[in-house]
Amino acid sequence: PKYSDVLLAVGEIDCRIDSGIIPHKNKFPEKEIKEIILTTVENYLTYIVNNNSDCQHNVIIQGIPCPNIDVRNHSQKNIKQLVEVIRIFNYELKMQSKGKGFGFLDTHQLTNKGDGMSNGSWHIDDYHLSPEGMQEAWRRYGSEKSYEQF
């Protein structure tokens, strides 16, 4: 319904080693990875703004959780690049979302063990959060909203 709360998850598939931004960067090495991310995020959020004008939903954008992949299956260089892509993507997603009046559900901070990799507490597989992880992300989101009021 119009004016309802809507959670949208964008970019999770873009932020994998084998799909999205990293393979695109490898195919077009002259492109800067930050520019690829910036354009990707801008395009997602502009699409949402344009398609939400009639309904006026209260949009909350979900961030990208830290990767929970088996690091033994990938080179250290690829792992480092993945962590950096997810970090930059989340930063842009958060900043641009707030700039457009959207909320931001930070699943990256929740899952980060300190080095950009998953702490292993909230995932159900390599990429997706468990129901408990989502509940904890929402609990923290509510705490942030309460704090921002002061």
What residues fall within each predicted segment?
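Alpha-helical cap/lid subdomain in secreted, periplasmic
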Residues: 1-131
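Conserved catalytic region of serine esterases and O-acyltransferases that act on ester linkages
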Residues: 121-128, 132-150
